Amino acid sequence: MNKNVKLDEAINLIKDGDTVALSGFMLATAAREIMVGIGERFKNTGSPRGLTVYQGAGIGNNRDQGVCEMSFPGLIKRYVTAHFANNQPMIKMALNNEVEAYNFPQGVISHLYRQAAGKKPFEITRIGLNTYCDPRLKGGKVNEAAKEDLVELIHIDDVEYLKYKVPKYDIGIIRGTTADEHGNITMEDESSIIDSLDIAMAVKASGGKVIVQVKNIVSSASINRKDVVIPGVFVDAVVISEEPETYHRQTPGTFYSPVIAGKYNSNEFSISGVIFDERKIIARRAIEELKSGSVVNLGIGIPEAVSSAAVEAGISDIVLTVESGLIGGIPLGGSNFGSAVNAWASLPMASQFDFYNSGGLDKSFLGFAQIDSNGNINVSRFGDRIGGCGGFIDITQSTKNIVFCGTMTSNGLKTKFENGKLVILSEGKTKKFKNSIDEITFSAHQSRINEQNVILVTERCVFKYDDEGLILTEVAPGIDIESEIFGVMDFRTRISENLKLMDRKIFDK
């Protein structure tokens, strides 16, 4: 049976009120041509409408491409995601209560697909406890329109767990590279597998239809079965991209690179250096927590500088990982975020989060935006600015050793190091250490329950988490504790009896 269909025929499979699962990580494995087609169909006909959309990672280019191209009031009734990827139309809909919006951890959503594939009704996990995902706080609800409880607190053998509901998926919209006439899908040009296979299996187990966007159609005789990632039994319709350079990009920044596809390694890519500024100071202090051979996850922003500092310090054998499923190699940032070059392996995203949730990471280096006196951290929402947690909650609740990296203030901070002292030239306008934060993405209380080792590194000092909260353990040379640390905080912390100076070598250009 030839499953190759036109775009319009594929969209006809989507009915009003369907629950749709979308694959993708930014634009990697994102079926953008189909998403654009759905948006155009709705604008022209008013259908399909009332959809419930699930996605794991943020899907788009953080501007004007991706799920935002089908984010219209009426088209999407409910939106469940780990990250909004700066989807401004959807954020506006959420703020106006024109959509029921939920924000759950990326690993949890990827595991919902796998649970559905096995016809299991729930994902039971400790991920999300005591964060905004916990029903004792917000239950993952982004707005007032989100009335239904999709997560429940339960106890098993007197231990707390969260029970996330597994929906019945009607439609899966995923992406591969090549299809044969039976619908067998290979992914040789994609940056990684991400959640395409898990979504296909979840949808078929639910009795739904799976639509796959590809670049190529070939005869089954020409496909090596070892290359097939999604068997044709999971596929109902195959749509060939008519404009692959526009709609079938490996990443927002790259149409196609064989190195990003993992076809061979290249010495052209290297971990780039970082100019001497606050980021480099923080990264240099952070790598003091790093050991050779460590398996690591780096968050976006300042933590990305950790890999550069490690190379500079001669720590070259750390194993970097990416939430999308890549292990080893050099993770890429910016418009290629979520991909890597010279990676050792590519796992399905759900399997990567199995590894994370099991405590497989030796260290995680992540950013912070707001922190309260208890040590709770917010990175997911700031008033009307809705970002999402991504994989932050999965990682910070599962990694034994966590290093939070960030400046004391933001929006205008300038420093220099002279005469052996760190000098604050101008303070940032935005305080990060606040009496109250907008929501809890990292729970210090849960961290203590999990017996994690947590420190927080800034350009001017270091805090450690202990059973009583935060304690100041290190200060940069030249920094006045009262005016330049506590003076830019809404609260005070305890000061260690063994307070020490940060190593002066950290500040050498």
Where on the chain are the PLM-derived regions?
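Short glycine-rich or small-residue beta-strand-to-loop segments that form or flank ligand, phosphate
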Residues: 19-24, 52-55
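Conserved phosphate- and dinucleotide-binding cores of soluble alpha/beta proteins
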Residues: 3-12, 26-44, 54, 60-70, ...
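Glycine-rich phosphate/diphosphate-binding loops that line cofactor/substrate pockets in enzymes
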Residues: 6-19, 167, 285-295
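Nucleotide donor/acceptor-binding cores
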Residues: 18, 47-51, 77, 293-294
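Generic N-terminal amphipathic, Lys/Arg-enriched alpha-helix
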Residues: 14-21, 262-272
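Glycine-rich phosphate/ribose-binding loops and adjacent secondary-structure elements
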Residues: 49, 272-276, 280-291, 295, ...
